[in-house]
Swiss-Prot record:
Alphabetical keyword list: Electron transport, Membrane, Mitochondrion, Mitochondrion inner membrane, NAD, Respiratory chain, Translocase, Transmembrane, Transmembrane helix, Transport, Ubiquinone
Protein name per Swiss-Prot or TrEMBL: NADH-ubiquinone oxidoreductase chain 6
Family statement: Belongs to the complex I subunit 6 family.
Protein purpose: Core subunit of the mitochondrial membrane respiratory chain NADH dehydrogenase (Complex I) which catalyzes electron transfer from NADH through the respiratory chain, using ubiquinone as an electron acceptor. Essential for the catalytic activity and assembly of complex I.
PANTHER family hit by this protein: NADH UBIQUINONE OXIDOREDUCTASE SUBUNIT ND6, NADH-UBIQUINONE OXIDOREDUCTASE CHAIN 6
Species annotation: Sus scrofa
Species lineage: Eukaryota, Metazoa, Chordata, Craniata, Vertebrata
The enzyme's E.C. designation: 7.1.1.2
GO MF annotations in UniProt: NADH dehydrogenase (ubiquinone) activity
GO biological process, one term: mitochondrial respiratory chain complex I assembly
One Pfam family this sequence matches: Oxidored_q3
Reactions catalysed, as given in the entry: a ubiquinone + NADH + 5 H(+)(in) = a ubiquinol + NAD(+) + 4 H(+)(out)
């Protein structure tokens, strides 16, 4: 059941990026990125990374949502273009969705999928096994290493997010 949930979340993840890559309007492109980011955090949570999924959700969807808000405010249109307003964009979006659904149907129906590389059922989607982690989880050890050995990485990341928000605010403020 867990592998089916991961498979469905991966499909929604790809559909969100198909919606983003068809670029109808900055508002809908930001919506596609937000949906894909939330589903990506759900995938991380599904594989047991509760703290990492929460942090990515808070940082990506909290911090980058500010940037999306300012960029869409800068590029507002009276009549924003949607996916169905342009026949070429709509055709590319529908064909991408149909290819994704055909791939999902083929992978769920067949026991073995071999297109470019070979899958033996949904069990090959498992990335790692946490049975041998002992008393400490791998996630807790990674977080401890990030804040003890990677202090400068955390500081540089925080400053770059702050500078990004300040630059976007200065651009949208006007001349």
């Amino acid at each position: 059941m867990t592998m089916y949930i991961a498979f469905i979340l991966s499909t929604i993840f790809v559909i969100g990026f198909v919606g983003f890559s068809s670029k109808p309007s900055p508002i809908y492109g930001g919506l596609g990125l937000i949906v894909s980011g939330g589903v990506g955090c759900g995938i991380v949570l599904n594989f047991g990374g509760s703290f990492l999924g929460l942090m990515v959700f808070l940082i990506y969807l909290g911090g980058m949502l500010v940037v999306f808000g300012y960029t869409t405010a800068m590029a507002t249109e009276m009549y924003p273009e949607v996916w169905v307003s342009n026949k070429t964009v709509f055709g590319a979006f529908v064909s991408g969705l149909m290819m994704e659904f055909c791939m999902v149907y083929y992978a769920l129906k067949e026991e073995e999928v071999e297109i470019i590389f070979k899958f033996n059922g949904l069990g090959d989607w498992v990335i790692y096994d946490t049975g041998d982690s002992g008393f400490f989880s791998e996630e807790a050890m990674g977080i401890a290493a990030l804040y003890s050995y990677g202090t400068w990485l955390v500081i540089v990341t925080g400053w770059s997010l702050l500078i990004g928000v300040v630059v976007i605010m200065e651009i949208t403020r006007g001349n």
